[in-house]
Amino acid sequence: VIDMMQKLNLQVKEEHSRHSFFLLMEEVTLATCKQAVEWIFENNFQEDRADLLNMVITSPGGDLNAAFALVDTMRGSAIPIRTIGLGQIASAGLMIFIAGEKGNRILTPNTSILSHQYSWGAFGKEHELFATVKEFDLTTKRMISHYKKCTGLSEKKIREVLLPPQDMWLSATEAKELGLCDAVKDIN
């Protein structure tokens, strides 16, 4: 089944230029984000540009640094990007989803959202661990800044409801109440 979904995903990506749709229906990795970045660049450099790009997202999360590379590219796009969430949007996938154009971040009613604190394992010499702690702090600050920009929530509220010690699962309606999306509706 996974192999079939990957083949379907690749077929749609080959045709996305004509339809201005991109499916991110997998783990967030450098490779998957590279494909999305290329799609955004290709569409932005076309003479006859689309008015709106559509990124459909179902993701269990993954590499947060790769996600932020895509987020920065989305922010730099001259073409607004609508994000459409289906099924589950978790962790790094959520960072990408909320970067969509305000007013154009749509969740379907059955979408589950997962937000949690940044996690990372580390080992090494003392100086290496101190460097890791600094990177951990910088990444947490980037996450909070991104949440603030995309939701309008205060840092205190973000830490309470989106980045508490435990994983935070939200329904699509709860996500809308927190400003993570702009609409909850079926795809027509």
Locate the predicted segments by residue.
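Terminal-region recognition feature
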Residues: 1-188
